Amino acid sequence: MRKVPEVLPHDEHNAALIANVHPPDWTNPEPAPRYNLVVLGAGTAGLVTAAGAAGLGAKVALVERHLLGGDCLNVGCVPSKSLLRSARAFADVRDAERFGVNVPKAPEVDFGAVMERMRRIRSRISAHDSAARFRDLGVDIFLGEASFSGPDTVEVGDTTLRFKRAVITTGARPVALPIEGLAEAGYLTNETVFSLTERLGRLVVVGGGPLGCELAQAFCRLGSEVTLVQQSPQLLIREDPDAARILTDALQRDGVRVKLNARAKKVSVSDGEKLLHLEVAGGEEVVAADEILLGAGRAPNVEGLNLEAVGVQYDTRKGVVVNDYLETTNKRIYAAGDICMAYKFTHTADAAARIVIQNALFLGRKKLSALTIPWCTYTDPEIAHVGLGERQAAEKGIPIDTFTTPLAQVDRAIADGDDEGFVKVLVKRGSDTIVGATIVARHAGEMISEVTTAMVGKVGLKTLATVIHPYPTQAEAIRKAADAYQRGRLTPRVKNLFSRWLEWTR
């Protein structure tokens, strides 16, 4: 069983966090004779499953070996977004002169205070995921290592929990990339980077996915020299290439050195500094750093669960094998969240947990594939997406029409000085059925839900053109894309008919 990192530093905020999500004085309850659900893992999927099932009257046990709240609360969404907000505050002051505001001297970052703020926010939010709160919701909380011991039993230390159904929600963890010398040199991951108390002079981020891009921008704005290394030809390989280009330009303006088509070959140490050797076009390049942060590489937490004993198939890279109903190969056992799903987001774990509750407790047949899943990368600007992109539509052989509104044509974006970005909506050719959208804007994550709602409700782009948006808002870009669809329907023949009618009625 792997050793989880210690929560550092030892201050009042982390003490409050631990008191909520892994109380040192916690006593596991006496187990019930039998549970409707035993949930293994108290990240987002586990917490939502446990609370939802208990709220419906089920007898539920929830087992967690480390910290309730999982990655999202402790080493993911919450601390990273706190850091990003501080970084954005710095950038706003830095760029204030663009708005006619003169700052007497260059803004300075107190990195220790930034991290202290993050820990304070995290401890405050942790009350929502606390052991005491879930106990009061009617969930039996067991702190300890869990493993299956029989067809309907789970062992937690010396305690046996008997279940009718079980749910595996143990999540995933960062893993070292196969880079020669990396382990010996040492590296940071999302599990350790938020324990920093002093600013890094030089940071290399390996991996240009969401985490890598977000933290590269944050640390650069907070005063570190940052190099972002990506093996593929674009950042955020899953995203629209136009969106990735805008983000690359934004990162470079902030001072991030972006290295695309660069493969990390090995790490060496010389005179106390870490040297990352890159394979790039035309040869090799060496980047010196104080620390290396891995922004790529995840592995499912399947070890120690004794899944073989209950016939649950799994892959050490992809996780627990599930069908569209989130059933494992043992029909009494389900899984949800990062342990089994390709889309490793907090909100998809939440949605999957709701599917599990219906299917495991009420003979439901809710399908994972029926979900419409948006996501957002919280850089500045943000990149939000839902449904298909142009590449995915082409791969699936789906003919599409694309309607794009540059933010440079949106009054609020111009007034805010945030006019770099766009709204791009894809519809099935010959119809107004929305199949996907990408938004690049400072608050794209807040905007994408309008398109997601339309897709879930089967509302076409034509209808969005009739929705009155307050003026001025950046969300008007969505209506403008819908207006472009409407104009496309005005064929020469229709326009000629309109002209003849108007001439006749003049």
Regions found by a protein language model. Name each.
Residues 4, 40-45, 52-66, 78, ...:
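Flexible, glycine-rich terminal cap/loop adjacent to redox cofactors
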Residues 50, 54, 216-221:
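Gly/Ala-rich phosphate-binding loop of Rossmann-like dinucleotide-binding domains
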Residues 47, 213:
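Residues forming the Rossmann-fold NAD(P)(H) cofactor-binding site
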Residues 38-40, 146, 161-171, 205-206, ...:
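Short hydrophobic core segments
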Residues 2-35, 51-58, 63-199, 227, ...:
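Glycine-rich flavin
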Residues 183-200, 285-362, 446-450, 454, ...:
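FAD-site-proximal beta/loop scaffold in flavoenzymes
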